[in-house]
């Protein structure tokens, strides 16, 4: 591993570039426009996805478990506690939480709601 390798320096390997690709193909192939979009996570990736959806004019719900962020408005969307997901009718959720332990808890939460991976929720991590 070295600091000058292409995957460390080329713009196409930037974190946000991959997010843009994932979002593009999610919207093209997986998103059901009759279902509301939800973003789970309000870190760098969550904010990037939120910004892109706003730019595309796609409305969405935004959930997280960070008490400091819940209730705040970012890009014109108010962050809600993740428990509000169960009140959203038939959502498709983009998960942007990178922490593996939290990802397992998130999957367990989806399981409790009878939601299926790659149909009802998608990890963008």
Q: Model features per residue range: what roles?
A:
Residues 1-125:
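Hydrophobic, well-ordered beta-alpha structural blocks that scaffold small-molecule cofactor pockets
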């Amino acid at each position: 591993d070295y600091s000058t390798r292409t995957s460390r320096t080329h713009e196409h390997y930037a974190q946000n570039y991959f997010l843009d690709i994932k979002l593009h193909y999610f919207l093209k192939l997986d998103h059901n426009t009759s279902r509301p979009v939800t973003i789970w996570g309000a870190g760098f990736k969550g904010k990037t996805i939120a910004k892109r959806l706003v730019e595309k004019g796609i409305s969405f719900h935004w959930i997280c478990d960070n008490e400091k962020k819940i209730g705040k408005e970012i890009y014109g969307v108010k962050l809600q506690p993740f428990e509000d997901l169960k009140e959203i009718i038939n959502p498709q959720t983009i998960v942007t939480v990178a922490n593996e332990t939290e990802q397992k808890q998130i999957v367990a939460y989806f399981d409790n709601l009878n939601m299926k991976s790659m149909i009802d929720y998608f990890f963008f991590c």
